[in-house]
Design a protein with these regions (language model features):
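Divalent metal-dependent catalytic cores for phosphoryl transfer on phosphate-bearing substrates
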Residues: 2-125
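Charged substrate- and nucleic-acid-binding regions of tRNA-handling and nucleotidyl-transfer enzymes
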Residues: 58-62, 115-209
Length: 209
């Protein structure tokens, strides 16, 4: 299928809700402007999701769409190609992007995108079932997904000598990542012991997710 036919097919697989239907129609609009062919004559559209989000924003601005719709549509397009694997770490990371409502809209778009491909490429639907089941379990358990869910806060960190400001913010975000990835339990003593072991000028390593 070409981009237009694929987009129309994806549109037929999403619910009749304006935000997700606009996102489905425009989700691959960035592909033509970033299409390249490699030495094996295989086509690629690297970066099309980000470019598509920027183009969609321009379109929605011209149409005088409200800001909430612009943000939701552009975020769905921006993240529609993000790999979400059927494991809890990956699902928690996806839930942290924009919250649970956005996550399930994103899954609807990803399902539609996959169903709009040729039959031999529609194999991800089973993975999506597992991913959504995991997400419901994570939400029902009230897993730690945000800084406010952490068992420690800024006052706790001050109590072990971590200064306010950039360092404290970096430590809190790092603790959240450690809990998200199951490297630490979300328990006050465990988090404070780990935080106390970090260097005074702690800065987390850069990630490329």
């Amino acid at each position: 299928l070409d981009v237009w036919a694929h987009s129309v097919a994806a549109l037929s697989h999403v619910p009749p809700e304006p935000t997700i239907r606009i996102a489905a129609l425009l989700h691959d609009i960035g592909k033509p402007s970033c299409f390249t062919v490699d030495e094996n004559r295989i086509g690629h559209c690297y970066g099309h999701a980000q470019i598509g989000a920027e183009i969609a924003e321009e379109i929605l601005l011209r149409l005088k769409s409200d800001r909430a719709t612009q943000t939701a549509v552009c975020d769905l397009i921006r993240f529609h190609d993000r790999l979400i694997e059927p494991n809890e770490r990956s699902v928690r990371r996806a839930l942290q992007l924009r919250g649970s409502a956005f996550f399930f809209d994103l899954m609807r778009l990803k399902r539609a995108d996959n169903l709009a491909q040729a039959p031999e490429f529609r194999s991800r639907q089973t993975d999506y079932d597992v991913i959504e089941q995991m997400a419901h379990g994570i939400l029902e358990r009230a897993d730690c997904l945000s800084l406010s869910d952490l068992a420690v806060n800024g006052d706790d960190l001050k109590g072990i000598g971590i200064p306010s400001g950039r360092t404290m913010g970096a430590v809190l975000r790092h603790l959240l990542e450690q809990v998200t990835d199951d490297h630490l339990p979300n328990e006050k003593n465990a988090l404070l012991t780990y935080a106390a072991s970090l260097p005074p000028d702690f800065a987390p390593p850069k990630t490329h997710e």
